[in-house]
Each structure stands twice: as C-alpha cells, then as structure tokens.
C-alpha cells in the first residue's frame, strides 16, 4: 500500500496548531479544512492533463486541463465533514458520497448506520476523508462498502494516522493509497491516537 506522510512545512505547522489542548471549535474547524485542502493537493498530483484550445483574451490559446477524471469525495460521518470543504475547494464539481459509521467505545468496532453513494461509482476515483485513522475499523468498513458498490480506485486522506491503523488498512486493502499529515506514535488503551488531536468529531462540532 502506498503511504504518503506529507511533510510540507505548512502541513506540519497546521497540524502542530491543531494539537493545542484548549483549541477553540472555530480554530480547529478552520485548520481541519486547511489541512484537508493541502492533502488534496498532494493526493491529486498524479492526475493526467491534456492540451485543450480555448478562446483567450487575445485569441485562441492552448492550456492544460485535467483529463476526464471523475471524482467522488467520501466523508465518513461525522468528523469527515470537517475536511470536505477543503477538498472541494480544488474540485468544486466533484460528487459527494456519504458514509455514516461510528466506533463503539467499548468494543472499538465500526457500526454502520447510513450510506448514500453516487451513481456510476465504478467510473470514479473515491477520495475517502476522515480526520483520524486509529484502529482502521471505520475506514476499512467504508472501503469494503465502496468496493461492493463497484468502486475500483480509492485514495484515503486523513489528518493523523496511527501505525496500527495503517497496518490494518494495508492488510485489508493493499491497493488503496493513504495520504496523511502525520503518522503518530500509536494508540492508547482506549483506542485513541497519541499524541493525536483528541476527539476530532467533538472538536469540529463543538460537542462533548
């Protein structure tokens, strides 16, 4: 499995800011969007382009355009919504699919509760977004679902990943690509990433 830890200074700086213990909901939300945007830039760097002639201000001009790439952005509810606007800034015409999965706090197992997948998913690249890749359970369940629907091309964008989650994802889906802002130390006894960001969903939505 291709794993890319984006080491751009802006990404590292913003993830560092997100680790502040008393960060406000507004600030955390802004940074989640910004880092999501920067990860999208990296994840789409292999898109092919083609030459197209358009009418410029001074007559015809040849420009580069992305070559027929159909994309669906797949936020995992609820925390994935915090990254969605940052991704869509670069691809405002992308379709959005939604998958609802929560992690049982006692068993740490993923529990699906909602899905709405775009049509022609088999023709699209899916960019699955979720702030945290901890145990990997929710991400694996989401990719299982997408593949059952016919999706053949999947990239995963997360803010912070634990080695345990990366290992589990690679074992289940070695054909996907993972882009993250930080690979952290690991999981604590409750299944949270350390040092991590805390509960990203609560911080994005202002709930506890």
Swiss-Prot record:
UniProt pathway annotation: Pyrimidine metabolism; UMP biosynthesis via salvage pathway; UMP from uracil: step 1/1
Main enzyme class: transferase
Keyword RNA-binding on entry: no
Reactions listed under catalytic activity: UMP + diphosphate = 5-phospho-alpha-D-ribose 1-diphosphate + uracil
Residues bound to uracil: 193, 198-200
InterPro entries given in the database record: PRibTrfase_dom, PRTase-like, Upp_B, UPRTase/APRTase, Ura_phspho_trans
Annotated family: Belongs to the UPRTase family.
Protein's name in the database: Uracil phosphoribosyltransferase
Organism of origin: Aeromonas hydrophila subsp. hydrophila (strain ATCC 7966 / DSM 30187 / BCRC 13018 / CCUG 14551 / JCM 1027 / KCTC 2358 / NCIMB 9240 / NCTC 8049)
Gene encoding the protein: upp
